[in-house]
Every structure is written in structure tokens, then in C-alpha cells.
Amino acid sequence: TEVAAIYPITPSSPMADYVDQWSAAGRKNIFGSTVKVVEMESEAGAAGTVHGSLGVGALTTTFTASQGLLLMIPNMYKIAGEQLPCVFDVSARTVSSHALNIFGDHSDVYACRQTGFAMLCETNPQEVMDLSPVAHCAALEGKTPFLNFFDGFRTSHEIQKIEEWDYEDLKDMCPMDAVEEFRAHALNPNHPSARGSHENGDIFFQHREACNSVYDALPAVVEKYMNKVNEKLGTNYGLFNYYGAPDAERVIIAMGSVNDVVEEVIDYLTAKGEKVGLIKVRLYRPWSSEAILKVIPKTAKKLSLIHISEPTRLQLIS
């Protein structure tokens, strides 16, 4: 990240606060520069700043949740449509309706499913540390913005000892050629280009459909960087990870912090001889049916979805 456009909203505020502190202290990023932090008047302003900053070739990030994320949706459509790589870090939180609720669920990120952002989910603080670089690297190589999310409070405020990335490892994993290509694509008076122009129906649809090839290729790009993480850390991250009995007949599909709890329940049940398992969803958008079919046990008779039932059920059925 070279620029962070921020506006505080619970429970995402500590992320922006840490970046602001690190910037003020002169802490460098992997490119050897200090992150420029810009606090705006609202989340809508922060999203607009992200869009503009990306347009001039700066690697840009923001942090938000709930109604704050909803205010960013208009710019998210533009960012995705222009294939500008960035990462929105979201501590997923309930969207307030009849009453305010600051606790975690996925109603805010589900509202962004149609924006064109890829969506990557983590279970616990260690996974956030391990997989956030995957979002950044895949965004650059895949030319697609990412919404990197985890459960508000349950994960965002969890106190846990973690293994941290070394900056040299991060630099080694970063696709520098993609970074240079992104910067070369920036708005520049020396090689002017038109952005956000008007198109009539004769070409608008064709241009909109042309991006499908990018999304079709993206799961393989994400998997590539997950494998790089696995090589460095000895982990086994995948687009979907299976946990449980190899001959499970009942399988739960879940996403987010609930996975750690489900794993403990599966350990208890399999010790008693029950054939149960868990599929952990990591890459939620674009959904890879091919990848999830590889991890569903051939013996499975029942699939149950926890916490992600309606939106993910549509994906699973398709």
C-alpha cells in the first residue's frame, strides 16, 4: 500500500489507526516509502479517494464495515469496471436497519456481491496475516479489486499470538512486473488516455462482457499465491479447505470465524465415530464450482450451510 484513504467506523477503525500511526512514525512499506494516509469526510469520500488515487498509479487501500461499505458501492462498480487493483479490508458487520447493531455478520459484504470485486475471507487473526498478501498480489496480477473480509469483533478484535510476515518475504512474493504495468497504465499527460467515457448500447454490452475472461482466470491466480504462501509458511491454504473424516456423509459448508468452532465439534464427533466434515470457504467471489467439487467427499449425502445459507446456496446449486 502506498496510499490509505480512511474514515473511521466500528469495528474497522483500529486498522486505519495502526496505518496512521505507522505512517506518522515513518515506517516504510516494501517499496521503501511511507504510506500516505488521507482521512476523508465520509466513507463515500474515502472510496472516491481510492478511485482517484488508483487512477494516477498509486497502490491504494481502505478499511471499512457495515453502512460505511455500502456508501462505497458506487465507486466500487467504477473501480472494478476499470480493472483497478486494490484491496478493501472489511471487518464484516451487521448492516443497521430497525436498530443499530455493531456486531459481526456478512450482510454488508453480501451487498457487494454484484459490484465486480473479488471476495476473500479469513477465519482468524493468523489467517488474516497469512492471506491478506494473497489479496494484494492476486489483485495486481489479476487486474481485479479485492474485498478482503473477516468477522467484525470476533476476528477483528481477537487477541491472539501470531507469526508475522517478514518484509523480504512479502517483497519476494509481490509481482513487481504487475506493479510496473499498473503504474504504466496510470493517467499521465505524457501519454493521455480517456477514462469513464460514454458508450452507447452498440459497444457497452460487449465491453462489459469482455471482462468475464478476467474473472474466469482469477481463481487460478488466487490459488497460485496461496501456494506461494503455503511454500513459505508450511500451510495448506486453498480456495476451499476440507476438514474432517475422509468418508464423511454429513458436511458443513461455512465461512468466517465459525470455522474454528466447527473444527472442534468435528474433532469431538469423529472421535465418537461419526462421519462428518467441514468445507471452509476462502474465495467467495469469483466462486469456483470446480474447486469446491474437488473437496466435497464422494461419500457425502447431506450438505449444510452455516451463516451463509441464502447467497451461498444459490452458488452451490448453480
Regions found by a protein language model. Name each.
Residues 31-35, 146-241:
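Conformationally flexible catalytic loops at phosphate/diphosphate-handling active centers
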Residues 306-318:
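Single conserved hydrophobic/aromatic residue that forms the stacking wall/gate
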Residues 93-94, 150-157, 256-258:
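Glycine-rich beta-alpha junction loops
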Residues 102-152, 176:
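Conserved thiamine diphosphate
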Residues 242, 246-274, 287-294:
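Redox- and metal-dependent alpha/beta enzyme cores, enriched for Fe-S-associated oxidoreductases
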Residues 20-22, 77-79, 136-138, 163-166, ...:
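Short, solvent-exposed amphipathic alpha-helical segments in soluble enzyme
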Residues 1-111, 116, 133, 153:
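Thiamine diphosphate
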Residues 99-102, 221-237, 254-262, 281-289:
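A general structural motif
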